[in-house]
Amino acid sequence: MALLQISEPGLSAAPHQRRLAAGIDLGTTNSLVATVRSGQAETLADHDGRHLLPSVVHYQQQGHTVGYAARANAAQDTANTISSVKRMMGRSLADIQTRYPHLPYQFQASENGLPMIETAAGLLNPVRISADILKALAARATEALSGELDGVVITVPAYFDDAQRQGTKDAARLAGLHVLRLLNEPTAAAIAYGLDSGKEGVIAVYDLGGGTFDISILRLSRGVFEVLATGGDSALGGDDFDHLLADYIREQAGIADRSDNRVQRELLDAAIAAKIALSDADSVSVNVAGWQGDITREQFNDLIAALVKRTLMACRRALKDAGVEAQEVLEVVMVGGSTRVPLVRERVGEFFGRPPLTAIDPDKVVAIGAAIQADILVGNKPDSEMLLLDVIPLSLGLETMGGLVEKVIPRNTTIPVARAQDFTTFKDGQTAMSIHVMQGERELVQDCRSLARFALRGLPAMPAGGAHIRVTFQVDADGLLSVTAMEKSTGVEASIQVKPSYGLTDSEIATMIQDSMSFAEQDVKARMLAEQKVEAARVLESLTGALAADAALLSAAERQVIDDAAAHLSEVAQSDDGDAIEQAIKNVDKQTQEFAARRMDKSVRRALQGHSVDEV
C-alpha cells in the first residue's frame, strides 16, 4: 500500500528542495540580476558575458528590445528608445517636465496627471516600461537557473516614496514576478559587505548611481542591520556628470543646435565614453559630429566638483541625523558605477578620513545583497538570524484641534513598525471624526505635508472627551503606510492606505528637516499658543453647555460675572497673546468654581433621590 505524503500547510512537500530566488537591482542607467548558488551570491551574465543590462527599452510596432540592443537604437530612434525611466516612476507629468525639460520624448498626461510616453507601440507609462526591463532580467535568471523564480527582492533608492515603491511593485507584478520584498539599495549593499567581511559598528553607504544619490548611516551588530539615518538626492547621479560633460563638449565643438536628437545622442554617448576612460587615463580624445579634441581629467573634475560637493553636504546632514561623527564611521561602502570616478573616491575618502571600500564591484554590490536577502526570504536559509531594519525619512502624525500636528511615528523610526495612539472627541454629541494624516517635522499643519484624509463615522453620541478612538499607524517593510481608526466601545472602524500619486523630492525632504531645526523655537511658541486657543475654546464650549443646563443655580449678579469672564476669554482667544489667554482661562475657572460646586451638589442630590442612608 502506498504511503500518503503529508507536508506542513504552506510548505513544499519536498522541504529540502531548494527554491529559486533572485535579487534585482532595478537601476536608472543599468540593471542587474543576481542569485545565490553553492552558498555564494553572484550576478548573472547574458550570452555575451555581460552582467549589466542597460535600463533602456526600444519600442516598435511589432515588439520591443531591452538592454544593449535597445541602446544601439538610441541615436537613430530617440523618441522610441526610453532610458532612465526610473526617474519618472511615481512622478506627475508636470513634475517630470519641470525637472527634466530636455527629455526627447512626447508625453501625454493620464487622467490622474501621470506621464504617458508616445511610442510606436502606443502610449506607455513608466510602470509598463519598467516591467519590460524586469521581464528581461527574469528571463536571464530563469534560463541560468533552469526554472521559474519563486520570488524576487527588488532594490529601490532609500528616498523612494510610497508612490514610487508601489509603482515598482506594480511593474514586478506586471512582469509576472512574486515580490518577496522591496529593499533599500544602501541596505542591500550593507548586507553584501556585512556578510562578506563581518564588520560590526557604524558604516556609511555612499551610493552614487546613474540617476540617484543615497547616503545611509547604518549600524551592523551581530547580524542586525539598522539604518540610523538616510539622506540623498533622487535627481543627482552619474547621468548628471554625463550631461555636464556633453554640454562642455558641445561648447568646445561649437554645436549650437539642440533640436537634433541624433546629435544630442552622439554627444551624450561621447561624454559617457570619455567619463569612463578618464577613470584610468589623464586625458582622452573625443571625436563627435565632425569635431575632434582632447578632454582632461582635470577639466572633467572642474565640471563635476559642485555635484560631488552636494553629495558630501548630504553626507554631513545624514551624520547629524544619526548623531554620529565622521570619525566614528568604521567603513565607507561605495555603491554605484559613478563611484569609480577618481574625484568621487578622493573626496569621499577625505570627508570620512579613510579610504572607501571597493572590494565588491560597486555596480554589483546592491544586486548581490538583494540576492542574499531573497535567498533568506524564499526559505532557503530558515535558520538565518539576520535582521533588517530600515527607517522612515519623515515623521508621520495626525492633525489635532487648533491646526496642530501630533506625531505618531517619529522620523528615522525603524520599519516595519506599528504605533497606536488614543484620541477623543472635542464636542458634546460628536458622532464623526475627520482623520487627517500628516507628514513632516513642524508643529503646525500649515507647515507639514498632507498625505490623506478620511472620516470615522458612527461614533456614539457622548459628552466631549467621552469617546475613545484608537488610531493605528502601520508602515510595512516596503515603506507603505496604512492608518486605521477605531472607536473602542463600538468597534466602529475606518482605514486608508496612503498611496499618493506622486511624492516629495529628496531636496524637499531635506528642506523640511532643515526648516524644523531653523524654526524650532518659533514652532514651539506657535504650538503653545495654539494649545492655549484650543483650551480656551474647550472651556467656552463646556461653559456654554453648563449654563444652558443649570443657569437657574446662579443669581443675576453671579451670571453677569461669569458672562463677563467668558466674554473676555472669547476676545483674548482671538489674539496671539498666549499669556493673556492663559490668565483669562484661569479667571473663568476662578469665577465658575462656585457654579461647578453647585452643579455637583445638584447631581449628587439627584443620584440620591429615593434612596435611604442605609442603601448608600
UniProtKB/Swiss-Prot annotation:
The keyword ATP-binding applies. It comes from the Bacteria. The keyword Nucleotide-binding applies. Keywords: ATP-binding, Chaperone, Nucleotide-binding. GO terms for molecular function: ATP binding; ATP hydrolysis activity; ATP-dependent protein folding chaperone; unfolded protein binding. GO terms for biological process: iron-sulfur cluster assembly. Belongs to the heat shock protein 70 family. NCBIfam families: HscA, PRK05183.1. Chaperone involved in the maturation of iron-sulfur cluster-containing proteins. Has a low intrinsic ATPase activity which is markedly stimulated by HscB. Involved in the maturation of IscU. This is Chaperone protein HscA. It comes from Citrobacter koseri (strain ATCC BAA-895 / CDC 4225-83 / SGSC4696). The gene is hscA.
